[in-house]
Swiss-Prot record:
Its main location: secreted. Belongs to the lysophospholipase family. This is Probable lysophospholipase 4. It comes from Schizosaccharomyces pombe (strain 972 / ATCC 24843). It comes from the Eukaryota.
Length: 673
């Protein structure tokens, strides 16, 4: 991993000005410099940078037309909170209603293409046809790019043939958290464009957010100056700023196709884009976790918050209520703004994606276990991180819309009652690194979920099923007392079984029998938990198990991960696997309508469904090897088939840089999902 010294130091400089009040620490502003400066392109050390930063500007500072600052508007309704008991938001329901005919048409086309022998008029019809959701896990750039490869496999716009082509267009919902939120958010906010365009024109993968202009010192300084000015706009408007503001503005420049990452572009503004107005693609949802001020770790029953184009809120615990997305940032008392005015522009697209990915903040707070006290940067990093932790700046603060709010379930306490702000953190910090939760609510009637798992599990960075185990445990533990509102979940085995049986070496189906789930042995209906299709990251053609904190990729790495994910998702373009996915998609519809299972599907379920077997011995350490060529029609179980590379993922050079920097110990110290 490579992070430029100059970029990192400037990042810390700006963070210091945010963390410390005037008078405690004086850090001069970073100025623009003339392009003809003698320092242009030089790899100067940080002491020179600090001297440069104190100079007078050679040019007038660049201006920003759009402001990052939230502002006041007249509220459209006195009571802004919508109770979850009302079901779906009216706007979301309208979107889904408009999309039903398009989804059914795409599903019919896909199923017909597979040759599955089924009566489509009975299985795919009206609003009771199959509903597909696709969930993209967290995991930094690894998750964004690996998820992008799976996205390509499902997308009919992708230039390479895929037997799964059209499944993206067949989906009703798409969700993402952390690195997966970068994928979902970047696609959605850029008019639901395709991955190839984003990779080539927007993501700028070859350069880190610390130094997006490589070794060009002048441009990097201008970049940080722009970040500083944008955050100052929000701060001067009277709003608390956190490290997430800085992170979000930096991320925006890699994810939003607009000048300086669109400081005035909001997440809710996607409603104005043509794809959204036409309901052409799945409805996007971004996920974050809540953390109370006194908590240092995320409890298993934390409230999971979701961001959609129409609203922000949670279906969980003592809240179960939503505020319109365009009014996020408005402080409410019992659902009403005290001064009859609302905040607008707080739902900045970059800030939302940064909120779902505050894991970056967490790694900074773990630095002190790894940086030596005699290091050049010890004092300055120690000072900023100590202050950030003390002031809860390792989170994303949102003005609290839930003060004095009581739901109809008075037996459950509103945990956010005492606080002026709600603190949100990375959506994977509760161990549920795949955003399945929004797709389990009964109001959305999702029949099947594709879970794209790019999680980094120890020891070698491949997913071991920990995320789906965590979701299963949350459902079993908390659904019974009605503190959460989901339909249940398929039974999921322990991680040892997942590894021992090779369930993480290929796509695996869970919950194939709708009568055998945590919801109990009942006739299958719209309240039955969805069937889960688990797609783990696996080395078909490339070692894609790079660190979560990898900040840049060259073309070889990016293309390698994209291709590997495509091959893993399609099972080497296996048309038989496409038939089995069609079976998974229609299974709940067949069960609900009491239709017989096609013979082809029975064979598929024998091959891909977990049959309830539990491992009785301890699994070996999971360290798969990459295939030098994809020569088989399906992924191996336990060991690779075909011609295998002799290099294991634990030693692969392409995923581990040979040139190490002092900060690498920080990034590698606590490899989270």
């Amino acid at each position: 991993m490579y992070v430029n010294y100059i970029g990192l130091f400037a990042f810390v400089q700006i963070s210091l000005t945010l963390a410390y009040p005037p008078g405690r620490v004086e850090i001069s502003e970073i100025y623009d410099f003339e392009e003809s400066s003698s320092y242009k392109g030089q790899d100067i050390d940080t002491s020179v940078l600090y001297t440069l930063s104190k100079r007078k500007p050679a040019l007038v500072k660049r201006s920003t037309d759009a402001s990052y600052a939230p502002f006041n508007v007249t509220c459209s309704n006195d009571n802004l909170l919508r109770p979850a008991s009302e079901g779906l938001n009216e706007g979301e329901q309208s979107y889904i209603n408009k999309r039903i005919s398009k989804v059914n048409s795409e599903l019919r086309s896909f199923i017909s293409k597979t040759g599955l022998n089924v009566d489509l008029d009975k299985v795919v019809n009206s609003s009771d046809g199959p509903r597909l959701g696709i969930a993209f896990s967290g995991g930094g750039l690894r998750a964004m790019v690996n998820g992008g490869g799976a996205f390509n496999a499902f997308d009919s716009r992708f230039e390479s043939d895929s037997p799964l082509s059209g499944l993206l267009q067949s989906a009703m919902y798409i969700s993402g958290l952390s690195g997966g939120s970068w994928l979902v958010g970047s696609v959605a906010i850029n008019n639901f464009t395709n991955i190839t365009y984003l990779r080539d024109n927007v993501w700028n993968l070859e350069h880190s957010v610390f130094a997006p202009h490589g070794d060009n010192v002048i441009e990097n300084l201008n970049y940080y100056n722009d970040l500083r000015k944008e955050i100052d706009q929000k701060k001067h408007a009277g709003f608390d700023c956190s490290l997430t503001d800085l992170w979000g503005r930096a991320l925006s420049r890699k994810l939003v196709d607009a000048e300086r990452g669109g400081p005035g572009i909001t997440y809710s503004s996607m409603r104005n884009q043509s794809w959204f107005q036409n309901a052409d693609y799945p409805y996007p949802i971004i996920v974050a976790d809540s953390r109370l001020e006194e908590e240092t770790a995320i409890p298993a029953n934390t409230s999971i918050f979701e961001f959609t184009a129409y609203e922000f809120g949670t279906w969980d615990n003592g809240i179960k209520a939503f505020i319109p997305m365009e009014y996020v940032g408005t402080h409410l008392l019992d659902g009403v703004p005290p001064d009859k005015s609302c905040i607008h522009n707080y739902d900045n697209a970059g800030f939302v994606m940064g909120t779902s990915a505050t894991l970056f903040n967490s790694f900074l707070l773990d630095w002190n276990e790894n940086v030596k006290k005699n290091d050049t940067y010890y004092d300055i990093l120690h000072a900023i991180l100590e202050d950030l932790s003390k002031h809860q700046d390792d989170i994303a603060p949102y003005p609290n819309p839930y003060q004095n709010y009581t739901t109809s379930n008075t037996s459950v306490v509103n945990a956010f009652e005492p606080y002026d702000t709600i603190d949100l953190v990375d959506g994977g910090e509760d161990r549920e690194n795949i955003p399945l939760w929004p797709l389990l609510h009964p109001q959305r009637f999702v029949d099947v979920v594709f879970a794209i798992d790019s999680t980094y599990n120890d020891p070698y960075g491949w997913p071991l099923g920990s995320s789906i185990v965590a979701t299963y445990e949350r459902v079993v533990t908390f659904n019974a007392n009605k503190s959460v509102d989901v339909r249940g979940f398929p039974y999921i085995p322990d991680e040892n079984t997942i590894i021992s049986l090779g369930l993480n070496t290929r796509p695996t189906f869970f919950g194939c029998d709708g009568k055998n789930t945590t919801a109990g042995n009942h006739d299958v209906d719209n309240n039955t938990p969805p069937l889960l299709v688990y797609f783990p990251n696996y080395p078909w053609t490339y070692y894609s198990n790079i660190s979560t904190f990898t900040m840049s990729m060259d073309d070889k790495m990016a293309n390698g991960i994209l291709e590997n994910a495509f091959m893993s998702t399609t099972q080497n373009n296996n048309e038989s696997f496409a038939v089995c996915l069609a079976c998974a998609i229609i299974q709940r519809s067949l069960e609900r309508k009491k239709l017989s299972t096609p013979t082809q599907c029975s064979s598929c379920f024998q091959e891909y469904c977990w049959d309830g077997t539990l491992a009785t011995s301890t699994a070996s350490v999971y360290d798969p090897t990459v295939m030098s060529a994809a020569t088989t029609s399906r992924a191996p179980s336990g060991t690779t088939s075909g011609t295998a590379s002799s290099t294991t993922s634990s030693s692969v050079a392409s995923a581990t840089p040979t040139h190490k920097h002092w900060w690498d110990s920080i990034f590698e110290a606590k490899e989270n999902p």
